[in-house]
Amino acid sequence: MFNPHALDVPAVIFDNGSGLCKAGLSGEIGPRHVISSVLGHCKFNVPLARLNQKYFVGQEALYKYEALHLHYPIERGLVTGWDDMEKLWKHLFERELGVKPSQQPVLMTEPSLNPREIREKLAEMMFETFSVPGFYLSNHAVAALYASACVTGLVVDSGDGVTCTVPIFEGYSLPHAVTKLCMAGRDITEHLTRLLFASGFNFPCILNKAVVNNIKEKLCYIALEPEKELRKSRGEVLGAYRLPDGHVIHFGDELYQVPEVLFAPDQLGIHSPGLSKMVSSSIMKCDTDIQNKLYADIVLSGGTTLLPGLEERLMKEVEQLASKGTPIKITASPDRCFSAWIGASIMTSMSSFKQMWVTSADFKEYGTSVVQRRCF
């Protein structure tokens, strides 16, 4: 039987990303735990030496990658591996947060244009597998905008698996104007890996995605003017990185050429507009009455937007694409890799949010389709 007092306790918040899952409790200023969205299953039928485990989660899986088959249950922002996702949530509930899911409501962020079947499967799993008392799906971009104390604006969201521009008006996303690019941080990391091998750097540790990802995060940047940067830096060493095995790799213009694919996806054979044109395209699909409001509140969200130089390059190109004299403001919070989680924490801590929960009683009466009517 549903207990309404179960909604009075702090909610568990999951921000499920292709690369990272962030978990914590509502009302807190940031997620308590951030783990890699990966599971490692033993390559052999016996548990890993001296450990009674058949699978490993997050960083532990990445650390033991040579003995494991790595599975990423979220691809391009969408849950695709449900069995592995269940294990990951179980790990977060029990091992990381130390809570009983049957005693606390759960809010999950979801990507824009999340398919109906995935939304309903999420609700089904939370209510039937984990027996949560309440559940809510919040649009990832809406939550990120909320963290910036705005309800109208355009969110530029780029994480590990997908990049999208999402116009939001008075707290609701405008699906017809969402622009999505199936390319983000993971693709930049893979592009850098290919470049390292092509340059003759075939050290075994480069096979470890975490190492190359760290190189990207520490050294790569977005050039304000790529062609001018190329003329200026050709042949120069722009950065160096010491690998775990002690070898030192020196880098030149590839440090800005690799992430340039965000603004020129055709370099990876992806025939889609780059980031600046995505912003312009999304805004132009909206009613003319709100276009200036969207330009005036562009909010960056997601770990890939932390690349140095991205904010300045985006501002320069959006100014060129917008009508002359259009006021443009870009907000780039230092903690924007967690902005959706933070926004969800703020939302769920408000007393008015209690009426938003889809309760276990609602689920029992209406079934999985209840999320279509209540979460938007």
Swiss-Prot record:
Major localization listed first in the record, in broad terms: cytoplasm
Annotated keywords: Cytoplasm, Cytoplasmic vesicle, Cytoskeleton, Nucleus, Transcription, Transcription regulation
Subcellular location(s) of the protein: Cytoplasm, Cytoskeleton; Cytoplasm; Nucleus; Cytoplasmic vesicle, Secretory vesicle, Acrosome
BP terms from Gene Ontology: negative regulation of DNA-templated transcription; regulation of DNA-templated transcription; regulation of smoothened signaling pathway
Reported tissue expression: In skin, expressed in the basal, spinous and granular layers of the epidermis. Also expressed in hair follicles, sebaceaous glands, eccrine sweat glands and semen.
Gene Ontology MF annotations: chromatin binding
GO CC terms: acrosomal vesicle; actin cytoskeleton; cytoplasm; nucleus
CDD domains, per the entry: ASKHA_NBD_actin_Arp-T1-3
Presence of keyword rRNA-binding: no
Highest taxon listed in the record's lineage: Eukaryota
Record-linked InterPro entries: Actin, ATPase_NBD
Pfam family of the protein (one): Actin
UniProt disease annotation: Mutations and insertions in the coding sequence or in regulatory non-coding elements of this gene may be associated with Bazex syndrome; a cancer-prone genodermatosis with an X-linked dominant inheritance pattern.
Family the entry assigns: Belongs to the actin family.
Function: Negatively regulates the Hedgehog (SHH) signaling. Binds to the promoter of the SHH signaling mediator, GLI1, and inhibits its expression.
Listed name of the protein: Actin-related protein T1
Name of the gene encoding the protein in the UniProt record: ACTRT1
